Amino acid sequence: MRAVIQRSKEASVTVANNIVGEIEHGLVVFLGVQASDTEKEIKWMAEKIRHLRIFEDDEGKMNHSLQDRGGKMLIVSQFTLYGDCRKGRRPSYSQAANPEFAKRIYDLFIEEVKKSGLEVATGIFQADMDVQLINDGPVTMLLDSEKIF
């Protein structure tokens, strides 16, 4: 499982000219699923993101997490996080999970985050989405459940 996490002042997802998810002050999480992902990866990723200390304290140090702040999370599926660009000019998505499996893992990830009490908004799986966000910082983090980076 991979995630690109962006701290944002506000963010929204629009599908067919309708806003389907939006947050103020929180994290936008672009989530990619691979075929080998299990409940272990779901729990690890949800816990890691909720507790990443990437919000500033009164002294300007990144010392608070989304969980500490009671912030919101906008979760957007993005299979292209598993695009492999090492060969040729067209990315290969062979490491990305098939849509049926990926949707199940994506939905379970959302439920895992909701269990923590955080407010969660989402995009629509496999939809053509317009994502708008105002980065805060900017602060962008990359996570991989296999700890590649």
From Swiss-Prot:
A single Gene Ontology MF term assigned here is: Ser(Gly)-tRNA(Ala) hydrolase activity
Query: Which reactions is this enzyme annotated as catalysing?
Result: glycyl-tRNA(Ala) + H2O = tRNA(Ala) + glycine + H(+); a D-aminoacyl-tRNA + H2O = a tRNA + a D-alpha-amino acid + H(+)
- CDD domains linked to this entry: Dtyr_deacylase (cd00563)
Q: What is its EC number?
A: 3.1.1.96
Q: Which UniProt keywords apply?
A: Cytoplasm, Hydrolase, RNA-binding, tRNA-binding
Which Cys pairs does UniProt list as disulfide-bonded? none
- Spell out the subcellular localization from the entry: Cytoplasm
Q: Please provide the Gene Ontology terms (biological process) for this protein.
A: D-amino acid catabolic process
Q: Please indicate which superkingdom the organism of origin belongs to.
A: Bacteria
Q: Which GO terms describe its cellular component?
A: cytoplasm
Motif Gly-cisPro motif, important for rejection of L-amino acids: positions: 137-138
- Comment, domains: A Gly-cisPro motif from one monomer fits into the active site of the other monomer to allow specific chiral rejection of L-amino acids.
What is the role of this chain? Answer: An aminoacyl-tRNA editing enzyme that deacylates mischarged D-aminoacyl-tRNAs. Also deacylates mischarged glycyl-tRNA(Ala), protecting cells against glycine mischarging by AlaRS. Acts via tRNA-based rather than protein-based catalysis; rejects L-amino acids rather than detecting D-amino acids in the active site. By recycling D-aminoacyl-tRNA to D-amino acids and free tRNA molecules, this enzyme counteracts the toxicity associated with the formation of D-aminoacyl-tRNA entities in vivo and helps enforce protein L-homochirality.
Q: What is this protein called?
A: D-aminoacyl-tRNA deacylase
The lineage is:
Bacteria, Pseudomonadati, Thermodesulfobacteriota, Desulfobulbia, Desulfobulbales
Gene that this polypeptide is encoded by: dtd
